[in-house]
Protein backbone atom coordinates (compact mmCIF):
# COMPACT_ATOMS: atom_id res chain seq x y z
CA UNK A 1 0.00 0.00 0.00
CA UNK A 2 2.78 2.37 0.98
CA UNK A 3 4.72 1.55 -2.19
CA UNK A 4 1.64 2.20 -4.29
CA UNK A 5 1.14 5.58 -2.60
CA UNK A 6 4.75 6.53 -3.30
CA UNK A 7 4.46 5.40 -6.91
CA UNK A 8 1.33 7.49 -7.36
CA UNK A 9 3.01 10.51 -5.85
CA UNK A 10 6.03 10.08 -8.13
CA UNK A 11 3.85 9.67 -11.22
CA UNK A 12 1.97 12.82 -10.30
CA UNK A 13 5.23 14.70 -9.84
CA UNK A 14 6.45 13.63 -13.26
CA UNK A 15 3.15 14.57 -14.84
CA UNK A 16 3.17 18.00 -13.26
CA UNK A 17 6.79 18.57 -14.23
CA UNK A 18 6.35 17.44 -17.79
CA UNK A 19 2.94 18.97 -18.46
CA UNK A 20 2.75 22.45 -16.86
CA UNK A 21 -0.73 23.58 -16.06
CA UNK A 22 -2.26 27.02 -16.32
CA UNK A 23 -0.71 28.99 -13.43
CA UNK A 24 -2.94 29.84 -10.52
CA UNK A 25 -2.77 32.97 -8.37
CA UNK A 26 -0.53 31.19 -5.87
CA UNK A 27 1.83 30.12 -8.67
CA UNK A 28 2.03 33.71 -9.91
CA UNK A 29 2.85 34.97 -6.42
CA UNK A 30 5.58 32.33 -6.05
CA UNK A 31 7.11 33.31 -9.40
CA UNK A 32 7.17 36.97 -8.35
CA UNK A 33 9.50 36.16 -5.44
CA UNK A 34 12.65 35.45 -7.54
CA UNK A 35 12.67 38.72 -9.54
CA UNK A 36 11.97 40.66 -6.35
CA UNK A 37 15.02 39.10 -4.69
CA UNK A 38 17.13 39.23 -7.85
CA UNK A 39 16.37 42.94 -8.17
CA UNK A 40 18.99 43.58 -5.50
CA UNK A 41 21.46 41.07 -6.90
CA UNK A 42 22.76 43.25 -9.74
CA UNK A 43 23.04 46.19 -7.35
CA UNK A 44 24.89 44.04 -4.80
CA UNK A 45 27.20 42.66 -7.49
CA UNK A 46 27.96 46.16 -8.71
CA UNK A 47 28.63 47.35 -5.15
CA UNK A 48 31.00 44.44 -4.60
CA UNK A 49 32.88 44.84 -7.89
CA UNK A 50 35.62 46.87 -6.22
CA UNK A 51 35.75 44.64 -3.15
CA UNK A 52 36.06 41.16 -4.62
CA UNK A 53 36.74 39.45 -7.93
CA UNK A 54 33.61 38.10 -9.70
CA UNK A 55 34.42 34.37 -9.65
CA UNK A 56 35.48 34.58 -6.02
CA UNK A 57 32.24 36.35 -5.13
CA UNK A 58 30.24 33.60 -6.79
CA UNK A 59 32.21 30.87 -4.99
CA UNK A 60 31.80 32.48 -1.55
CA UNK A 61 28.11 33.09 -2.23
CA UNK A 62 27.42 29.42 -2.83
CA UNK A 63 29.78 28.29 -0.04
CA UNK A 64 27.64 30.26 2.40
CA UNK A 65 24.42 28.92 0.84
CA UNK A 66 25.81 25.38 1.14
CA UNK A 67 26.56 25.88 4.85
CA UNK A 68 23.02 27.18 5.44
CA UNK A 69 21.36 24.28 3.59
CA UNK A 70 23.57 21.53 5.00
CA UNK A 71 21.92 21.19 8.46
CA UNK A 72 18.41 20.88 6.97
CA UNK A 73 19.16 18.92 3.78
CA UNK A 74 22.45 17.13 4.38
CA UNK A 75 20.81 13.70 4.10
CA UNK A 76 20.95 14.02 0.32
CA UNK A 77 24.76 13.72 0.46
CA UNK A 78 24.73 10.34 2.20
CA UNK A 79 25.74 7.14 0.36
CA UNK A 80 22.66 5.53 -1.18
CA UNK A 81 20.91 8.86 -1.76
CA UNK A 82 18.96 9.37 -5.01
CA UNK A 83 21.53 12.05 -5.84
CA UNK A 84 24.40 9.75 -6.76
CA UNK A 85 22.76 7.74 -9.58
CA UNK A 86 21.88 11.14 -11.10
CA UNK A 87 25.19 12.90 -10.42
CA UNK A 88 25.83 13.73 -14.09
CA UNK A 89 22.49 15.52 -14.37
CA UNK A 90 23.09 17.45 -11.15
CA UNK A 91 26.60 18.32 -12.31
CA UNK A 92 25.03 19.89 -15.42
CA UNK A 93 22.41 21.71 -13.33
CA UNK A 94 25.17 22.99 -11.06
CA UNK A 95 27.15 24.26 -14.03
CA UNK A 96 24.27 25.96 -15.86
CA UNK A 97 22.25 27.22 -12.90
CA UNK A 98 24.20 27.86 -9.73
CA UNK A 99 27.77 28.29 -11.00
CA UNK A 100 28.02 29.40 -14.61
CA UNK A 101 24.97 31.66 -14.76
CA UNK A 102 25.89 33.77 -11.75
CA UNK A 103 29.63 33.81 -12.48
CA UNK A 104 28.99 35.14 -15.99
CA UNK A 105 26.63 37.82 -14.68
CA UNK A 106 29.09 39.00 -12.03
CA UNK A 107 31.85 38.99 -14.65
CA UNK A 108 29.65 41.03 -16.97
CA UNK A 109 29.05 43.66 -14.28
CA UNK A 110 32.80 44.31 -14.22
CA UNK A 111 32.87 45.24 -17.90
CA UNK A 112 29.34 46.38 -18.77
CA UNK A 113 26.66 48.68 -17.43
CA UNK A 114 23.64 47.56 -15.44
CA UNK A 115 21.40 48.79 -18.28
CA UNK A 116 23.17 46.70 -20.90
CA UNK A 117 23.21 43.62 -18.66
CA UNK A 118 19.49 43.91 -17.97
CA UNK A 119 18.70 44.56 -21.62
CA UNK A 120 20.52 41.46 -22.87
CA UNK A 121 19.09 39.34 -20.04
CA UNK A 122 15.57 40.40 -21.05
CA UNK A 123 15.94 38.21 -24.14
CA UNK A 124 15.69 35.09 -21.93
CA UNK A 125 12.02 34.35 -22.87
CA UNK A 126 13.07 34.14 -26.52
CA UNK A 127 15.89 31.70 -25.78
CA UNK A 128 13.55 29.73 -23.56
CA UNK A 129 11.17 29.22 -26.48
CA UNK A 130 13.98 28.31 -28.88
CA UNK A 131 15.65 25.85 -26.51
CA UNK A 132 12.31 24.22 -25.80
CA UNK A 133 11.69 23.81 -29.51
CA UNK A 134 15.18 22.58 -30.46
CA UNK A 135 15.96 20.21 -27.61
CA UNK A 136 12.70 19.35 -25.83
CA UNK A 137 10.20 19.11 -28.68
CA UNK A 138 8.00 21.97 -27.46
CA UNK A 139 5.91 23.75 -30.09
CA UNK A 140 6.02 27.54 -30.33
CA UNK A 141 2.71 29.31 -30.80
CA UNK A 142 2.27 32.82 -32.27
CA UNK A 143 0.81 34.05 -28.98
CA UNK A 144 3.95 32.90 -27.13
CA UNK A 145 6.12 34.86 -29.58
CA UNK A 146 3.88 37.90 -29.07
CA UNK A 147 4.11 37.41 -25.31
CA UNK A 148 7.91 37.36 -25.47
CA UNK A 149 7.87 40.56 -27.51
CA UNK A 150 5.58 42.35 -25.04
CA UNK A 151 7.71 41.21 -22.13
CA UNK A 152 10.89 42.56 -23.72
CA UNK A 153 9.09 45.81 -24.60
CA UNK A 154 8.19 46.23 -20.94
CA UNK A 155 11.85 45.88 -19.95
CA UNK A 156 12.90 48.40 -22.60
CA UNK A 157 10.32 50.84 -21.30
CA UNK A 158 11.88 50.71 -17.83
CA UNK A 159 15.46 50.95 -19.10
CA UNK A 160 14.79 53.92 -21.39
CA UNK A 161 12.41 55.70 -19.00
CA UNK A 162 9.97 55.83 -21.88
CA UNK A 163 12.46 57.60 -24.18
CA UNK A 164 13.14 55.10 -26.96
CA UNK A 165 15.89 57.29 -28.45
CA UNK A 166 18.12 56.15 -25.58
CA UNK A 167 18.48 52.77 -27.29
CA UNK A 168 20.56 54.43 -30.02
CA UNK A 169 23.16 55.33 -27.40
CA UNK A 170 23.68 51.75 -26.23
CA UNK A 171 26.91 50.06 -27.28
CA UNK A 172 27.57 46.36 -26.84
CA UNK A 173 30.74 45.45 -24.93
CA UNK A 174 32.40 42.18 -23.94
CA UNK A 175 30.31 41.86 -20.78
CA UNK A 176 27.09 41.81 -22.79
CA UNK A 177 28.15 38.60 -24.52
CA UNK A 178 28.78 37.05 -21.10
CA UNK A 179 25.16 37.80 -20.23
CA UNK A 180 23.97 36.34 -23.52
CA UNK A 181 25.86 33.12 -22.79
CA UNK A 182 24.41 33.09 -19.27
CA UNK A 183 20.88 33.53 -20.65
CA UNK A 184 21.31 30.59 -23.03
CA UNK A 185 22.55 28.41 -20.18
CA UNK A 186 19.67 29.53 -17.96
CA UNK A 187 17.17 28.53 -20.65
CA UNK A 188 18.61 25.00 -20.80
CA UNK A 189 18.73 24.84 -16.99
CA UNK A 190 15.04 25.77 -16.75
CA UNK A 191 13.98 23.12 -19.26
CA UNK A 192 16.01 20.49 -17.41
CA UNK A 193 14.11 21.40 -14.25
CA UNK A 194 10.83 20.99 -16.12
CA UNK A 195 11.79 17.58 -17.55
CA UNK A 196 13.32 15.61 -14.68
CA UNK A 197 14.19 11.94 -14.67
CA UNK A 198 11.97 9.79 -12.39
CA UNK A 199 14.67 9.76 -9.71
CA UNK A 200 15.33 13.52 -9.77
CA UNK A 201 11.57 14.19 -9.86
CA UNK A 202 11.23 12.28 -6.60
CA UNK A 203 14.15 14.15 -5.05
CA UNK A 204 12.70 17.50 -6.15
CA UNK A 205 9.72 17.05 -3.83
CA UNK A 206 12.12 18.18 -1.07
CA UNK A 207 13.45 21.42 -2.53
CA UNK A 208 16.21 22.07 0.09
CA UNK A 209 17.76 18.69 -0.75
CA UNK A 210 17.25 19.25 -4.47
CA UNK A 211 18.93 22.66 -4.27
CA UNK A 212 21.77 21.38 -2.07
CA UNK A 213 22.51 18.69 -4.65
CA UNK A 214 22.86 21.40 -7.31
CA UNK A 215 24.94 23.63 -5.05
CA UNK A 216 27.33 20.76 -4.29
CA UNK A 217 28.29 20.38 -7.93
CA UNK A 218 28.04 24.12 -8.50
CA UNK A 219 30.78 24.56 -5.90
CA UNK A 220 33.01 22.16 -7.81
CA UNK A 221 32.61 24.22 -10.99
CA UNK A 222 32.94 27.51 -9.10
CA UNK A 223 36.16 26.30 -7.46
CA UNK A 224 37.63 25.55 -10.88
CA UNK A 225 36.61 28.97 -12.22
CA UNK A 226 37.95 30.75 -9.13
CA UNK A 227 41.26 28.89 -9.31
CA UNK A 228 41.65 30.05 -12.90
CA UNK A 229 40.76 33.60 -11.85
CA UNK A 230 43.47 33.71 -9.19
CA UNK A 231 46.07 32.13 -11.49
CA UNK A 232 45.36 34.18 -14.61
CA UNK A 233 44.17 37.55 -13.27
CA UNK A 234 44.97 39.96 -10.40
CA UNK A 235 42.13 38.65 -8.22
CA UNK A 236 41.47 40.27 -4.85
CA UNK A 237 39.26 40.23 -1.76
CA UNK A 238 38.80 43.29 0.44
CA UNK A 239 37.27 41.89 3.63
CA UNK A 240 35.01 44.14 5.66
CA UNK A 241 31.43 44.70 6.74
CA UNK A 242 30.27 45.93 3.30
CA UNK A 243 31.45 42.72 1.63
CA UNK A 244 30.05 40.54 4.41
CA UNK A 245 26.65 42.24 4.06
CA UNK A 246 26.67 41.63 0.30
CA UNK A 247 27.59 37.96 0.79
CA UNK A 248 24.83 37.45 3.37
CA UNK A 249 22.21 38.93 1.05
CA UNK A 250 23.22 37.11 -2.15
CA UNK A 251 23.51 33.77 -0.31
CA UNK A 252 20.11 33.86 1.39
CA UNK A 253 17.89 35.90 -0.91
CA UNK A 254 18.91 35.50 -4.57
CA UNK A 255 20.35 32.02 -3.93
CA UNK A 256 18.35 29.88 -1.52
CA UNK A 257 14.95 31.59 -1.49
CA UNK A 258 14.85 32.71 -5.13
CA UNK A 259 16.08 29.40 -6.57
CA UNK A 260 13.61 27.46 -4.47
CA UNK A 261 10.72 29.65 -5.60
CA UNK A 262 11.82 29.59 -9.24
CA UNK A 263 12.04 25.80 -9.26
CA UNK A 264 8.60 25.51 -7.71
CA UNK A 265 7.19 27.95 -10.26
CA UNK A 266 8.67 26.02 -13.19
CA UNK A 267 7.18 22.80 -11.87
CA UNK A 268 3.69 24.31 -11.98
CA UNK A 269 3.76 26.85 -14.84
CA UNK A 270 6.57 25.69 -17.12
CA UNK A 271 9.83 27.36 -18.20
CA UNK A 272 8.31 29.53 -20.94
CA UNK A 273 5.98 31.21 -18.41
CA UNK A 274 8.58 31.46 -15.64
CA UNK A 275 11.02 33.18 -18.00
CA UNK A 276 8.72 36.17 -18.38
CA UNK A 277 8.67 36.73 -14.63
CA UNK A 278 12.44 37.28 -14.66
CA UNK A 279 11.75 40.38 -16.75
CA UNK A 280 10.04 41.90 -13.73
CA UNK A 281 13.50 42.29 -12.16
CA UNK A 282 14.32 45.77 -13.58
CA UNK A 283 10.83 46.97 -12.70
CA UNK A 284 11.19 45.72 -9.12
CA UNK A 285 14.61 47.38 -8.99
CA UNK A 286 13.01 50.70 -9.84
CA UNK A 287 10.26 50.19 -7.25
CA UNK A 288 12.78 49.25 -4.55
CA UNK A 289 14.74 52.39 -5.40
CA UNK A 290 11.57 54.40 -4.93
CA UNK A 291 10.99 52.80 -1.52
CA UNK A 292 14.53 52.93 -0.14
CA UNK A 293 16.00 55.91 -1.99
CA UNK A 294 12.95 58.12 -2.29
CA UNK A 295 12.94 58.07 -6.09
CA UNK A 296 9.45 58.71 -7.42
CA UNK A 297 7.85 56.04 -9.65
CA UNK A 298 6.61 57.23 -13.03
CA UNK A 299 3.85 56.37 -15.46
CA UNK A 300 6.20 54.29 -17.62
CA UNK A 301 6.75 51.94 -14.66
CA UNK A 302 3.03 51.16 -14.63
CA UNK A 303 2.94 50.73 -18.40
CA UNK A 304 5.95 48.40 -18.24
CA UNK A 305 4.22 46.27 -15.62
CA UNK A 306 1.15 45.99 -17.86
CA UNK A 307 3.27 44.94 -20.86
CA UNK A 308 5.21 42.30 -18.92
CA UNK A 309 2.08 40.87 -17.32
CA UNK A 310 0.40 40.80 -20.75
CA UNK A 311 3.38 38.82 -22.02
CA UNK A 312 2.97 36.39 -19.13
CA UNK A 313 -0.74 36.00 -19.86
CA UNK A 314 -0.09 35.27 -23.55
CA UNK A 315 2.63 32.75 -22.74
CA UNK A 316 0.30 30.56 -20.69
CA UNK A 317 -0.91 27.33 -22.18
CA UNK A 318 -4.54 27.04 -23.20
Regions of interest found by a model, annotated:
Residues 48, 57, 61, 108, ...:
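Hydrophobic/aromatic residues within transmembrane alpha-helices
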Residues 69, 91, 131, 140-162, ...:
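Hydrophobic transmembrane alpha-helices of multi-pass small-molecule transport proteins
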Residues 5, 14, 19-20, 29, ...:
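C-terminal-most transmembrane helix of multi-pass membrane proteins
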Residues 2-6, 12-59, 166-200, 220-221:
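Glycine-/small-residue-enriched transmembrane alpha-helix faces in small-molecule transporters
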Residues 47, 51, 65-83, 153-169, ...:
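Membrane-interface helix-cap regions at the ends of transmembrane helices
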Residues 37, 41-44, 70-121, 131, ...:
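Specific transmembrane alpha-helical segments of multi-pass solute transporters/efflux pumps
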Residues 58-60, 98, 102-103, 116-123, ...:
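Helix-helix packing/entry segments at the starts of transmembrane helices
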Residues 26-30, 56-71, 92, 147-153, ...:
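Hydrophobic alpha-helical transmembrane segments of multi-pass integral membrane proteins
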Amino acid sequence: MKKAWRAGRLANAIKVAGMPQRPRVTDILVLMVPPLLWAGNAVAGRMASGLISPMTLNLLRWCLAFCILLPIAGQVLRPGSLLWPQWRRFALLGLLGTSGYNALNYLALHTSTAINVTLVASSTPVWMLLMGRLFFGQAISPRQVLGAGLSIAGVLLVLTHGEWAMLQQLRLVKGDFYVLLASLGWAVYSWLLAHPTPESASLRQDWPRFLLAQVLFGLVWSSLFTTGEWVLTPAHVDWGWPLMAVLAYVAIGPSILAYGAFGAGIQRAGPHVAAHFTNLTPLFTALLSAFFLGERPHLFHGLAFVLIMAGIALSRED
